[in-house]
A protein has these predicted regions:
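Catalytic or ion-coupling anion/metal-binding cores of large enzyme and transporter domains
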Residues: 2, 14-64, 68-70, 75-96, ...
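Basic polycationic patches enriched in arginine
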Residues: 8-11
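Active-site glycine-rich loop that binds ribose-phosphate moieties when present
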Residues: 115
Length: 470
């Protein structure tokens, strides 16, 4: 990749709720004025020795609203052990976190900004010296990276992990198959019992969607952009080894604090290109086109849709992952995980290897001992017909979308398509037509008013496409 977009994020730019973060040294036993604050900490069991150590915020979006968030509390305890082992005092707190596929349109994108604001407010209010964030969906991962960039304190992001796939009729299934089954049921090709069997089998474990959907896309971004411990993004949520990565995240944030390595040292222009590149290489979700500019804005970096489209056009598709491909995140993990994919990208010239990461080393240094395993079809090298993988991401511009639009779909052999437009003002209206098979082959579904203002909140309408596929 070109080595011409590496401007470092400025620590002075980016929005902020308050002024500078309070200094934790005010808790020193020598400070008479801090006695009330120390008394409150004693009430929670902290000793004077613990108060003298750096306070590290450990924020999770744990809740009982979605399977992607349910395993975060357990992993947070391992993060806290790592912080303690490295000489810090962890302070856990939570923020909100909806599921991108389980909320109304008014909640999803708005929640991203609320999460970022709430983390900033909490960290500044309590003067934490560093931050570890654990998130279980694409929106909360983006929000935590936004907050880290805004605060510019030593920080590590950690994904809670993908779910394992279910099994039905001797094949792996995911939530995507449930959406498709809804369409198949409407078409009369499967029975009520079939639909119920798919529904109950599709999600057998905690974790985000088992394919390269929004959560796993942003998890891959967190690793490629340099804010996550290498290898942590692709490990499924139920695996005990996630606790080992969580412990390492706690150790890592303390090392960053000792070395004064901050997010804006890592989040350069080239780092954002790496993030966009892994989205294309993995066949990831288009939501990255919403989140990457927002994270870059917190760093004072302009990384817009045009820049993302430029990276996508030059990046080969190297991983055959669902929803557009064949394999699941578990299969990617078995094939070497995100590091193996990044190694294939580096070999293909699709990564800036010199970018700094939370290890204190560059991406190329992190990947020095990583090899792309052979004997599987999950990851391909750039000379193994990688472009045969069907689904790609495109940024389009024209009279329908003067400011740009994002499209996912098969490689566009033809630049022309003619069909009848079926226009709807809500996802529910479109789903009703699908449910009654009120469409014909060649129809184009247009669902209006679903953007940040119209939805409001940028509702995902993937259920309609999946039902049509079914």
């Amino acid at each position: 990749m070109d080595e011409d977009a590496g401007a470092r994020g400025t620590r002075a730019s980016g929005p902020s709720l308050t002024g500078s973060t309070p200094n934790q040294t005010s808790l020193s036993p020598d400070s008479v004025a801090a006695a009330p604050q120390r008394a409150r900490l004693h009430a929670m069991g902290l000793t004077s020795a613990q108060m003298a150590r750096p306070f590290v915020g450990v924020v999770t979006s744990w809740n009982e609203a979605s399977p992607g968030n349910i395993a975060l509390a357990r992993q947070a305890q391992a993060v806290k052990r790592g912080v303690r082992d490295a000489g810090g005092t962890p302070r856990e707190f939570t923020t909100i976190g909806g599921s991108d596929s389980g909320v109304s349109g008014i909640s999803s994108l708005i929640s991203r900004d609320l999460i970022a604001d709430s983390i900033e407010a909490m960290v500044r209010a309590h003067g934490y010296a560093a931050l570890v964030g654990l998130a279980g969906c694409g929106t909360s991962l983006a929000a935590m990276m936004m907050a880290m960039a805004r605060l510019d304190l030593p920080s590590v992001i950690m994904f809670g992990g993908a779910a394992l796939p279910g099994r039905y009729l001797d094949r792996d299934i995911t939530l995507q198959d449930v959406y498709e089954a809804v369409g198949a049921h409407a078409a009369g090709t499967i029975s009520d019992d079939d639909l119920r069997a798919i529904e109950t089998a599709a999600c057998p474990s905690a974790g985000a969607g088992a394919g390269q959907f929004s959560a796993n896309t942003m998890a891959s971004v967190s690793e490629a952009i340099g804010l996550a411990v290498p290898g942590s993004a692709g490990l499924p949520a139920p695996y005990d080894a996630r606790d080992d990565f969580a412990h390492k995240a706690g150790l890592t944030v303390m090392d960053l604090l000792d070395r004064d390595i901050r997010p804006r040292d890592i989040l350069t222009g080239q780092a954002f290109e790496n993030a966009a590149s892994i989205v294309a290489a993995s066949g990831g979700a288009a939501c990255a086109a919403l989140h990457l500019p927002a994270i870059a804005h917190e760093c004072g970096i302009d990384f817009d849709l045009t820049a993302i489209g430029y990276v996508w056009r030059r990046t080969p598709r190297l991983a055959d992952l669902r929803p557009g491909g064949t394999f699941l995140v578990r299969d990617l993990h078995d094939a070497g995980g995100t590091p193996a994919l990044m190694r294939a990208m580096l070999n293909a010239g699709a990564l800036h290897g010199s970018c700094l990461t939370v290890t204190g080393n560059s991406i190329a240094e992190n990947l020095q001992q990583v090899e792309v395993p052979t004997g599987h079809d999950v990851i391909r090298s750039s000379d193994q017909q990688a472009d045969r993988f069907r689904v790609r991401l495109y940024v389009l511009q024209g009279n329908l979308a003067p400011d740009g639009a994002v499209m996912t779909g098969d490689d566009m052999v033809s630049q022309r398509f003619l069909g009848r437009a079926r226009c709807f003002d809500s996802e529910a209206a479109a789903c009703a037509v699908v449910a009654h098979c009120g469409y014909e082959e060649g129809d184009v579904f247009v669902i209006r008013h679903q953007g940040p203002k119209g939805g409001p909140g940028m509702l995902s309408v993937g259920a309609v496409a999946a039902a049509l596929s079914g």
